[in-house]
């Protein structure tokens, strides 16, 4: 029986059941008595619990069944009259074994366990009837010594030696046994222990009363009889005998704040003065207002000639005189001289002038574009001079540039460079788009292939299902045929169909065994969907039963 499965309410009987299990192989009779004692304890527990203890019936019945089995094994060895003597002798034997080992100084954990087993055996003995004082004393001693040895082992300390027995002080008749002497010695030691405990209690009471009396007497005559050390007194200013009193360190004295003497300021402690901050300026006084830095004012375009010195100087450009000047001599001297072309026919001159006009238009277009770009970017503008209109002069007439046409101004517009970069970016973008389209087409193709594979697999699964259905139908037909044939065989009638039966054939035992074997093979073949093998085995089975081939 598994003791761990017992309910908690039956925990007190577990030690006795353990002893019973340990003694089954060595002493079945003592194991039986321990189990009977456990059953009696369980019945008492159930009776005390009343209706709530009904769940204990099942484990109690199991213990009873095991006790009945032991009782059947014992048979005539059970003797109700001598059972108490047997249990007492067994308990005394266990007690003496543990006590001998203990007094020899060999106490260990097994010694503690043996003392505890003897204690349990003494409990079994007490429930069988009245016991002697010797049994009661040994029961108590076994319980105490078991706990004492176990506690010492747990604490890592050597067990204390057992109480000694003085053989010279043993009294009584000469026929007194050694165990009786030990019990008397134990009684004497117990009495001595009680006496010492009582004496200690009396001494404690006397000590408490004496302390109360002494405290009262001390409180009454403290000044006369006892002298306690006094705390040092504060020195008196008028006392001239300073040597008798203890001196304490003097703290620095601070002058009183109400002293009217001007000279006392010298004795005061000097504290650091805080720096004085200037007072903020008043709003009424305009001169004391904070001054801010003045930035230089920009010259106005209508400034007089006297302010020209303050204006920023810019690099001077070559000045051209206006063509409308009244002084013809000065104009001839100031204007640049250009080489004159030789006179030619009017037809050649018109062709050349038309070419010059086209080139001039190209130059003007390019200059306009450059001006638009320059106006879009932020560059400093030069100040306009309203007095001298030299920079606003009209361009010279076209006939003055006939000799050297401004071919050097022909430049390819910078937009072509940007257009080339844009074209490269567009080409790259188109290539990326083409690659993406290719990858998308590949993915579509792969998806289509996967879909085709899935459809093919689905078709294969459908075909397999159809084949399975056909096989199942064939199996059902075969099973029906077999059942019909078995019915015909059982009824003793002739075989139907193409089967020929010999009614006079009586199968032997070997034929029956072979037929049974092949019929089992029919069932196993049908389980694995092997229809041909099932048909073959069925025919062989019928052959052994009927004696003829089908």
Curated annotation (Swiss-Prot):
A biological process term (GO) from this entry: protein transport
Q: Where is the composition biased (Acidic residues)?
A: 353-365
Membrane topology reported for the UniProt record? Peripheral membrane protein
A matching Pfam family = Vta1_C
Q: Which InterPro entries match?
A: Vta1-like, Vta1/CALS_N, Vta1/CALS_N_sf, Vta1_C
Which GO CC annotations does the UniProt entry carry? endosome membrane; multivesicular body
Q: What is its main location?
A: cytoplasm
**Composition skew (Low complexity), residue ranges:** 220-274, 282-338, 372-389, 402-417
Identify the keywords attached in UniProt to this record, alphabetized: Cytoplasm, Endosome, Membrane, Protein transport, Transport
Region (Disordered) residue ranges read: 153-179, 220-460, 488-512
Specify residue ranges for compositional bias: Polar residues.
340-349, 429-450
Name where it's found: Cytoplasm; Endosome membrane
Question: What is this protein's function per UniProt?
Answer: Involved in the endosomal multivesicular bodies (MVB) pathway. MVBs contain intraluminal vesicles (ILVs) that are generated by invagination and scission from the limiting membrane of the endosome and are delivered to lysosomes enabling degradation of membrane proteins. Thought to be a cofactor of VPS4, which catalyzes the disassembly of membrane-associated ESCRT-III.
Family listed: Belongs to the VTA1 family.
What PANTHER family is this protein classified in? VACUOLAR PROTEIN SORTING-ASSOCIATED PROTEIN VTA1 HOMOLOG
Q: What is this protein called?
A: Vacuolar protein sorting-associated protein VTA1 homolog
The gene is vta1
